[in-house]
Every structure is written in C-alpha cells, then in structure tokens.
Amino acid sequence: MKDLVKFLKAQSKTSEDFDVIKIGLASPDMIRSWSYGEVKKPETINYRTFKPERDGLFCARIFGPVKDYECLCGKYKRLKHRGVICEKCGVEVTQAKVRRERMGHIELASPVAHIWFLKSLPSRIGLLLDMPLRDIERVLYFESYIVIEPGMTDLERGQLLTEEQFLDAEDRWQDEFDAKMGAEAIQALLRDMDLEVECETLREELQSTNSETKRKKITKRLKLLESFIQSGNKPEWMVMTVLPVLPPDLRPLVPLDGGRFATSDLNDLYRRVINRNNRLKRLLDLIAPDIIVRNEKRMLQESVDALLDNGRRGRAITGSNRRPLKSLADMIKGKQGRFRQNLLGKRVDYSGRSVITVGPYLHLHQCGLPKKMALELFRPFIYAKLESRGFATTIKAAKKMVEREDAIVWDILADVIREHPILLNRAPTLHRLGIQAFEPILIEGKAIQLHPLVCAAFNADFDGDQMAVHVPLTLEAQLEARALMMSTNNILSPANGEPIIVPSQDVVLGLYYMTRDKVNGKGEGMLLQDSREAEKAYRTGQAELHSRVKVRITEYVKNAIGEFEPQTHLVDTTIGRAILWMIAPKGMPFSLFNQTLGKKAISKLINESYRRLGLKESVLFADHIMYTGFAYAARSGSSVGIDDMVIPQKKYEIISAAEEEVAEIQEQFQSGLVTAGERYNKVIDIWAAANERVAKAMMENLSQEEVINREGQPEKQASFNSIFMMADSGARGSAAQIRQLAGMRGLMARPDGSIIETPITANFREGLNVLQYFISTHGARKGLADTALKTANSGYLTRRLVDVAQDLVIIEDDCGTHEGIVMTPLIEGGDVKEALRDRVLGRVAAEDILKPGTNEVLISRNTLLDEKLCDVIDENSVDSIKVRSVVTCDTDFGVCAKCYGRDLARGHLINQGEAVGVIAAQSIGEPGTQLTMRTFHIGGAASAAAKESSVQVKNTGTLRLTNVKFVTNKEGKLVLTSRNTELTIIDTFGRTKEHYKVPYGAVLNHADGEEVTAGETVANWDPHTMPVISEVSGFVKFVEIVDGLTVTRQTDELTGLSSIVVQDVGERATAGKDLRPALKLVDAQGNDIFIPGTDVMAQYFLPGKAIVSLDDGAEVFVGEPLARIPQESVGTKDITGGLPRVADLFEARKPKEPAILAEISGIVSFGKETKGKRRLLITPMEGETYEEMIPKWRQLNVFEGELVQRGDLISDGAETPHDILRLRGVHAVTDYIVNEVQEVYRLQGVKINDKHIEVIVRQMLRKAIITNAYDSEFLEGEQVEVARVKIVNRKRAEEGKPLVEFERELLGITKASLATESFISAASFQETTRVLTEAAVAGKRDELRGLKENVIVGRLIPAGTGFAYHQNRQKNRLVGGMENTTEVKLSAVDEEEIASEFTFSAEDATANLAEMLNMADDAE
C-alpha cells in the first residue's frame, strides 16, 4: 500500500512546481537523454495484426505498451507485473499513457542544419559566422567547398571554393589545408569558434568604427554572441546530429473502417527522414562514390527541413492528396496551431447553448433555463443527490432514473439548481460584460429567457441570437460567479463608468408616455393627497395619465447623522409622474421624476440612484422601472401607421426653389463663369440646404400640435404622434430616419464616398421611382460590404490591443511618484468639448489643488476625486489639475492603484490584482464595430467652410495670447509675426472658455490682457495667402530680383495692375539657379535697417511662387505686407476617420506627409540647395548647427533669420507621434494619442475614459533605447524594457555610479506585443517561428508574469482572485528557497494514515486504473 501511495504521488506529479520556463537549444546528449531508444525502421504497424513493428515509429519497446499493464506478446498482464520488462518482446509493463510522453531519437548519418536557425531572418548561423545566407546555403546543399583549416596555404578560413578551385588547391598543397562541404563543414566552423575572443575583437571594432551601418551590424553580432555566452548554448547545436522523435500518441495512426488508416502528417515526414538516413548509412558502409553520397546527404537535409518547417525552403513536400504536409512548425503556429487553438481557447464541459427569448417578468439576477438543458447540465449533481437521499443505490441506478425522467428527478433538479449560479455568454464576447452570472429559474420550452435590461451589455436582441450556458462546478467557482460576475454587480460599464443597465425601446417609450403632459386633459387641476390617490383617479377614469395636477409629494432627505427625514410639498406635476413616484426608492429627489423622461433622463436616474443609494437599491429600482415601462408602453397603444408620417406642405415649394437655383448655376457654368468643380460643390450645397429646410419644416409639423386649453385659447404642445414620440424619447429611430420617411431622402453617396449630385426628392411614404431606387442601391450595398469588413478589422484591433496590454495588472497600492499629467478642459474653438470635471473624475490628484489666486489647499494630493470633490472644483472654478496617470506610474512590472484611480465599473479606488490592461483593451475594442470604415472625401462645400478667416468670440472675458510676437501697424493694430500663436478667452474666474489658433500675419484688434465682449471679432486674416510682414518702416530695395531670370511679371486682366511672381528654383534658367531673390528695407539714405533689438538686417528672402505687388523703392510701414505667398487649399486631402485612424494611432504609423518639426531651438537659415530639396539649417545659441534636407514642394512656415523653439512646426502636415515623443516628451505624446483617439470615438458618440487609452500608451512606451551604457550590462543602441533600466539605475545610484542614459521609444502595438519580455506570449501572438528562434538562441527565461503565459501553462492567472495565490507562491518561494533543502520524511504512522484515507474513484486517474487498483487490493 505504501508503494501505491508513492506511485500515485509520482503519477500525479503536479505541474505547479515551476516558476520560470527557459527555452534553449538541445544538445545531442540532451536529445539522447530524453529518448527511450533509437527508431531504426520506417515501418509503423503491422497491417494484419495492427501491432506496432519493432524498432519502428510506433515501437512498443521504445515508447511503451499499447494497452495498460500488458506487454505486446501477452506474456505479462495485470497490475502485479508493473515495471517488469518482458524478455520476449522487450516491452515494459506500465500504463499506456506513457506513449504520450516517451520520446525516441534517430541518429543521423550526417549532421543536418536546423532550418529555423538557418532561414528564419536574420539567419542566426549566418550572423554568427558572419557569412551571407546564400553562401551558407551553397555549402549546405553541396554546391561549394568551404575552407575550415587553411594551414600553411594562402587560403582564408571560411573562404568558398568551387569544385575546380578545390581540385586546383588540392594539387598545389596536397593535404596542408582542410576544406569540406555540407552541414559537417558548417558544424566544424561553429565548433571552432571562440566566442569570448570574437566578442573582444568586436568590441574593439565597435570603438574604432565611425560608420553607422557598420556599428549596427557589429552590435547585432555582439548581442548574438553575448547571448550565446550567457545562455550556455553552444553554436554547433544549431546543426543537429541526433533528431528527436515525437511520442507516438501525439502523432497517432488511426485505423478507419475499410482497412485504411488515417495518419498524422508527421509520420510521413519521419518515414521519409528514416528512409533516407538508412540509405545514407548503407552507402557510407559501401564506400559509394562521392557524388551519390552527396546527393543522399542533400536529400536527408531536405527531408529534415520539411519535418521541422515544411515549405520554408523550396517547394513544400506534399502528401498523397497534393496538399502540403503539416510539419512541426505548422503544428504550433497560426489560428489552428497549438497556442491559439488548444492552449488559449479550449472547449468547456458542462455547457449548452440555445436561442434566447425575452423574460420581462424576471428579476435582474435571474434567467430562465429550459428544464431539458438543466437536467443535462446538472447531471452529476443530481446523481449525487439521488444517491445521498437514498432514492438510488448506485450511480448506475441514478443514471437510469434520470434517463426515465422520473417525477422525483424534477424535484431533485429544482433542489440542486437553487442558488447555483450559471454563466451566460453571448459570442462575440467583446468585453467582460459578455459573460455574466445569473440564477437559473426552471422553465418549460426550449429557449433561454434573458432579462431585457442586460441586453445592452451582451449586445443581444431576440431576432434569433443564441447564448451559451456554462456551469461553475467547484465551490470557489460558484463563489466567484456570485460575488463578481452576477449581473447585479455589473451595473456600470467598465469603459466609461456610466450605467449599462439602461432601459431601451419599449421601456423608454412607456416611461416617456407616462411622464408626458397634455393641455386640458381630463381631470386637469385636481388636488390629490398622494401618489396612491393619483393612481386611483387614473384607474377609475377620473383623470387622464397626462393631466396636469397638484399632488402632495413626500421626499426623504438625509440629515446630518445620515438618517432619512420626510419632507412634504405640494408639487405641480402630472398623474403619470405621480404614479411613477411610487416606485422611487427613498432618498431620490422628486425633481428627477418631474419631467418628461427620455432615454438620457432615465440613464441619469439610475446613475443618481447608484451614487446616492448604492447597488442593492439601484438594482431593485431598475427592475421596477422596467416593469412599469412595459406596463405603460402596452397601455399607450403606440403604433406606426402610414398617416403618422406627415409630409410638410412647404416641401414642394422648397424643392422647386432649389431646382431653380440649380438651373441658374448650370447657366453660369455654360457661360463659363464658374468651373465644373465649383458648379458641383454649389449644387450639392443647394440640395443639402434644401434637405435641411424640408427636414426642419417636417419636424415643426410633426413635433407640435395646437390644442384649445381650459380658457378656450389655442396653445401649442408637444405632439402625441407615435413616430415622433418614439424618436423624441430615444426609444427607436431618429430625426434623420423620420426625415427619410416623411421629408426627402436627400443626397446619396457613391461607394467611394463622393456624392451624387442628383438628390432623391421623394421620401419613403411617397415611394421612389426607378431611377431614385437605383441611385440609392449604390450606397446601401456599400454599407453592407463595409459592415462585414469592419467586423473583422475591429476584431483584429481588439486582439492586438489585448495582446499588448495583457500583462498590465494593478500590483501595488502606491508607487509614490510625484509625476502626473496636467488636465485642462478640452476646448476647441468657442465650445467646451469636455469639461474639466469630466476629465478628472475618478483620478487621483498628483499635487495639492489650490483655490485659484490663493494658497488655500482645496484638495490635498493623493486624494481620489469623486463627484463631491468635482463639485468643489467646479464651484472654485479651478482650470487645470495635475492628476496621477498610468503613463507616469513608477511601478516596475505593473501599475499602482493610485496612478490608475477609480475602478470605473465599481465606483471606488481600484483593487490590487485588477487586470486593467485587458479592461482597457476591451473598452477600446468593443465599440470598434460602431466606428465607420470610410475615409471621408470632404466636398468643396465643407472645405470652404473649414477655411476660417477670423476669430469671433462667444464669451465675454479677458483675451490671452501665448507664443506671441507682433508689430504694431500705423492704425495701431497688432500684426502677428509669430507662428503658432494661441488665443484664449478667460472668464472672470480665470477659467479658459475658448481657444483658437491664429496664423502668421493676422491682424488683432485687441492686445494681450484686454477685455473683449461676446460676439466681437478679435482677429482676421486672409485664408488664401500667407503674407510676408515688414517688421520695420522704410523703402523697399530689390535684391537679386531679375526679370525673366528669377521672377516673371504678371498683369491682372480685370484690374490691369502688374505684380512680380518669384519663380521656383527648378523652373529658372541656369544663370538664375544660385540667385536668391529678396526684399531689403533701407532708410531714405539707402542704408540698411536692422530689426529692432537685434543685429539682423531687415531682409526678407522670397520663396518660389511669392507675389510682390510693390515696386522697387516704394515706401512701406511697419506691419504692412511686403509680399504674398499663395497657400494651396488643404481641403482636398482625405481625412482618415473611423477604425483605420484608431489603428494607425495605436500602431504609431508615420503619416504620408508628416509635419516637419524643429529638432533644436535656434535661428533658421537656408543652405545650398540640391535638385529636389532645400537645405534647412538651425543655428543654436551655442553648440553645433543642425541641418536637414527638405523636399522643395513642402511649404515652409518659417523665414530666414527667424528664431524657432525645439518642437516648433517648420512645415505643416500631420504630426508623427515619434517626433512628438522625441522633441516634446512623454506627456505631449500621451496627450496627442489620447486626444486623437478620443476625437474618432467622440464623432460616433462613444464615451471611453481617457485612462484606457493611457494604459495602451504606457504599453507602447515600455521600451527604451540605451544612449549611454557606461559599464552596465546593456549595449548602446539596445532596446530594453524601461523597467529593467530603472532597476539597474536604482542599483547604480546606491553604488554611486553614473546612471545609464536612455531615450524612451514609442512602439506600435503589434511591435510592442512581439517585443514583450515573455516569449510565450509573443509566440502565441504572431510570427511564432521567429519569436521562438530568437528566444531559443538567447536562452530566454519566461518569468510567467502576464496573463497569457499563465493561461498557456495552465495556471491561475496573476490577476483577480489568482493575484493573491501568486503573491503567496512568491512569498513561499522566498521562504522555501531558504528552508526546503532537506527532503521531508514521513513517519510510518503518517504513511499508514495517508494510505488508509485513499479510496480510489474514477476521478483520481483513468477509470480502468481505478478498477484495476481496487481489484488488486481485493486480491491482496
């Protein structure tokens, strides 16, 4: 019995006792040590007896018995012979499952290069030997010789020789030198390498070389060599002499009926290798001619290549049915590979699926589960109950009872199911709310019933959706399901912290209908004592639901000690609102109910309820809201009839007026007054305006009706038209859809996004004619095609986001940093896009928040800003707050709770162990399908409007200018001479109200700090040209302006005025190439004038295309334009919107024409030009001049002699995030990405908290490039995790050494995922082969930090409830490392006790083992 316990312990050797997974190269000895014997024959099994052939690929002697505890010839059977090796057939008597783990090997007759290290770019073998891949392949595939030992000859080591050269050399030097071909040669070269010496020489070379490319190459080699030295891998192991053979049960051979076999492709590949290997051995024994042996060796190399990675080199080897065979590499990579198919996505037992239907009578925490399904899912529980209650004697009997469906079974089922939560999941599970727990209620029928309020979270509807049910089996699982996943615990959305349990559709319509008011309804003006009486009046028909009445309302308000005190008022309200008040929980104000409730208002109700009263009350309230909404929606009798779509009378006038305008434009076009493009834009403008007017007329018509009030006077009230009510309440439909039903359909788009100029003037009520129908099919199909593509793209974006962020978990409470990012309200132009309180809500303050203008601390640092504190911020009109952020968090391999702030789905500071990375990825990815795929082509109409030419303020306040340089012109107005000037309006409290960018050359009517009033124009400029502004007064002097050489004269036909146009350098004659036309300002005597305060001459160089209207010697005053540079219109560019834009931002892609930013601060000048580029020089105050070549066609925003700051725009365009990071730092790039991503989502009306985007940005910024390594373990130019550098720097700071210098690097999410520390995570994401090759050569260790790695090795994830488990393991590991050196010895008594506790059941091991053990026990 003792042995048995030991045996079982050995059998169930847990996979828990490892903390790191290391990957490396296998040495030949290691492969032999894994092996249980050599596979010598290609045979698999005997086709008659089906027994494995000896020494073949399925040999029982090597791999273990085919049947449990039975040798092949049948001499030894049963458990008592365990461990015996049969002398007849040589098979060990043991369990058959060892055939899954025992490996074999093949001794190769000639070495073979491993294809991964050869062909996976960059080729590791090539890099080590410093040879091009082509040369290595020529040696390997026997095309040329390579010199291994030159001896006393004038050959070089590693030199290639052709057949002829080799024969010549042999004649000259006989056997002085050694040259070989094939893998032996490569192996010999690798074996003879002295890595340490090689490293030294490379280091010296690195010091002495100056060329950038050489340095890069040397660094690459150096890294590889160092990783070989550190990992203990030997280079020659990249060439194999022994090939491991996979255990046979992992490449099974299955007999099909009809005498054929289904086999794994690997068997074919192995057979091919063995055949060729045996043939080669025979040829070598025979001492066959060289050419034959060589050919055989080459074929062996090819067959091993195919086994390891088929199709990597040459054509893929195909099987009998002409498809390529699946090699070992194919087994693990791709969606169908081991990682993604079996390790990350397993199928789950105890699950079922069915169609869902609506369950309007359920509570929020319940779902209806069909009896049939429940019986099947809870089977084992029922068996146990039947047996424990004595209804069945054995499991078998219980099984029979369940199959017969005896009456008692149903009672037991009800008992088992009570309070046993189940999980419901709807695919696609886009965020964590896609799986929630419910308590099952048994129902008849075959469809699962779902509570209507959770539909929004599941994104479910009842048009045939299916859902899957899973049963949490263990107590822990049930506990987690109840405490964390119950639908009642998921009221708020993790993406934005707003309620996700919001009523929609019928419920909204019912509540809206119930809370509407009506003029002169029946019973208007009644005085009622409370809600009960109001309901009575309604039920008895004394009053209508919408009548305006006075009711006594009792509200409950919390007093100082937090108890509810009743307060009663008489309130003007309606019967319906009074009835609705009956379901309001204590502590809610009546004002929230005393209004017409639309969808937004109802959402606010639930939000308020959650914030004021907590979870339980809110859940009950939400349920009541739903029941009430359904009831009154039924009573309202709203329906859609064709007469509800009222077509406005004005429609036909508006359309005919538009047609006349269009005809007029057409005439202008034909007489040549407008161009074709202008005509098109104007026509589209006209029709768009007409459509708006029709829509407006229609909505006015629909939304109001005139009724007679009690005084007999006509009064307007909101209409009770069903269609209008549905749209107005937010239940279904929108103004845009009603416009198509009762207005006009309007302009249609082609699939490429351009607009068809013939509008559809009809609406759906009138019906479309054939042409109109045809036009509209165009766009409609595009819509469907888009949706299909969008789903896939959005899913892929989510996958990349999850992958980059999966290992980000909250691992400590406070990292103690003082860093943070400064939040200000988001203002664009004159409107506040997002108020400050919305941006800082749920964040932690990084510094004390002071009352503006004083030193009084309002809120101290490290305080979580909740709703109450945000009110304080609002009241004191604070306009910028520094808050902690994930991006600036100092925690090494995770984030701290303080930097993250509030857990949006729970409303308090986030807990440790929360997987914030995955939550962020899901929150960003989940709305992805709602984003458009289109790139918008903006019509001329839109782009003309986009060109602003003035700033008109909307609020009264103080004008503030930042980054400003100006001169004052003779009218006393300011003329800007600075580039990126920003103009802000600040109110009396010092809050920013408006924010504008003002271009160079704008004329300002007010100076900095002056008061302006609302509606006033404070700045204007010409949007089509950029002026060159004179900074001094004087006389113009032309410099190098030669007519016909550098400039041409042009005369305006209409005005007759002539002007000079500067030619582009490329268009000038050769003589004019080096001339640089300029305008110089001189005084009356002709002396140079200097710009005030500098020693710079007032001389303005003119770029190509500049227009000068002044003549030589003309007088100019300060602030007047000397020349104009026409600006090309920017309106024609595509604006990438929607999903592609988000993907571009997260992938940190460079835009097509990036903005050019100043790399350093200094004075701009231009150097010698080349053919297509000009040379920009920036000279700083001290230090060396920076120069950059810029293409001629780029428009520059700077003039010669201008002072720029680092990071200023030199040429317009889209900014590259990499530039922003390099020149303006981490904060700027975070701001940029967050705002740009939010811009896309805001357009679609999707709310996502900034935090989530910051989390992704943190992951994109987790690598750094070492710029100065000193004597640390890093190399210069190496890419390292920032956390690693920080750890090293802390250590160096303690030792008093200089800190390693580094630059943060921004990686796109795909790159960042592949560059993660964990090779398991990277390999399961993309490019599996490359990742594993790199990891193996470097001998990487995977610390199993992230979630993905732990899922793959089959452990609890280090997040959520698994977080504590992992922390304990770490503690125990530290303690255990000291103590656990001696082995624990049990006393005999303990052994006995343990043994007596063992009774074997089918779960312990495989069923047959249990039976056998019990039999063996009986026998003893």
UniProtKB/Swiss-Prot annotation:
Annotated binding of Zn(2+) 2, by residue: 815, 889, 896, 899
The protein's Enzyme Commission number: 2.7.7.6
Residues that, per the record, bind Mg(2+): 461, 463, 465
Cofactor(s) the record lists: Mg(2+); Zn(2+)
Name of a matching Pfam family: RNA_pol_Rpb1_5
Gene Ontology process terms (BP): DNA-templated transcription
Gene3D superfamilies tied to this protein: 1.10.132.30, 1.10.150.390, 1.10.1790.20, 1.10.40.90, 2.40.40.20, 2.40.50.100, RNA polymerase II, clamp domain, RNA polymerase Rpb1, domain 3
Protein's recorded name: DNA-directed RNA polymerase subunit beta'
Name of the gene encoding the protein in the UniProt record: rpoC
